[in-house]
């Protein structure tokens, strides 16, 4: 199953839509205003996740004390072999339903943890060229993959979530996790943008690089699904390249106008001063 998590607004507020086969499934919102407070207190602001009618399904609660204690010792994981960062509790209609956090087990060994329904799913993030991937595991079995193109226009990120049908029940949590992931890793809070584009190539190296299987989507969903994803990614890159060329032309035109104005001003001043 393919689920798309598309950021629809990045100015003044961060809004997302979660859809599948053209049907809106959920909406989400993340904090926008950039605030720097002691002990990361700005993270006390909630991420929200709602159904199409706007009814809240989940919110987050920043585990302030737990994070303060856990993160107070730099490189604690070198001694304890495990240290949690960015712990957010998932709050549902019936109270706490799980948590999101990063587990650091070594200098080159980190993973995202998704606690829900009494289980812990692990997400391994990897930059490889023009895309970022998060491979989601249930134990030793891969159950999902999140693909994010690193070409972004106007800070509007998009994520493609492929998930095995037997895990469809956790689509809401994984979709909400994707918004949390964006907030933790690709957050552009406080930035006002228009007609901008970012085109990146990036590679990350770590102990868990082998968790990414480039053939997983084709194996689980068929070659057509893999080809369709590649087409979507190529389209995004093409749109980004076109936008970049447009921006270059506009900047060049602006400089040309400034040069012409400077020449005119010089001629006027010269004639005036004799």
For the regions a language model picked out, list residue spans one by one:
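A glycine-rich, hydrophobic loop/mini-helix early in the fold
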Residues: 44-93
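Low-complexity or membrane-interfacial segments used for flexible interactions
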Residues: 1-46, 82-87, 98-99, 104-271
């Amino acid at each position: 199953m393919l689920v798309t998590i598309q950021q629809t607004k990045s100015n003044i507020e961060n809004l997302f839509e979660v859809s599948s086969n053209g049907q809106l499934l959920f909406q989400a919102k993340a904090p926008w205003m950039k605030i720097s407070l002691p002990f990361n207190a700005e993270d006390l602001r909630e991420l929200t996740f709602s159904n199409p009618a706007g009814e809240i399904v989940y919110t987050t609660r920043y585990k302030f004390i737990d994070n303060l204690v856990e993160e107070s010792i730099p490189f604690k994981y070198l001694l304890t072999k495990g240290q949690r960062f960015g712990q957010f509790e998932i709050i549902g209609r019936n109270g706490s339903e799980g948590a999101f956090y990063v587990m650091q087990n070594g200098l080159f060994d980190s993973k995202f943890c998704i606690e829900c329904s009494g289980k812990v799913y692990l997400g391994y993030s990897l930059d490889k060229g023009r895309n970022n991937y998060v491979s989601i595991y249930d134990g030793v079995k891969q159950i999902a993959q999140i693909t994010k193109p690193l070409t972004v226009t106007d800070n509007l990120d998009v994520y493609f979530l492929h998930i095995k049908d037997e895990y469809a029940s956790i689509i809401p949590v994984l979709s909400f996790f994707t918004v949390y992931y964006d907030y933790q890793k690709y957050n552009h809070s406080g930035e006002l943008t228009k007609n901008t584009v970012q085109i990146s190539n990036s590679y990350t190296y770590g102990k868990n690089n082998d968790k990414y299987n480039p053939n997983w989507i084709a194996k689980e969903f068929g070659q057509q699904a893999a080809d369709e994803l590649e087409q979507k990614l190529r389209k995004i890159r093409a749109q980004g390249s076109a936008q970049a060329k447009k921006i270059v032309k506009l900047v060049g035109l602006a400089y040309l106008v400034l040069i012409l104005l400077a020449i005119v001003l010089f001629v006027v001043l010269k004639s005036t001063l004799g």
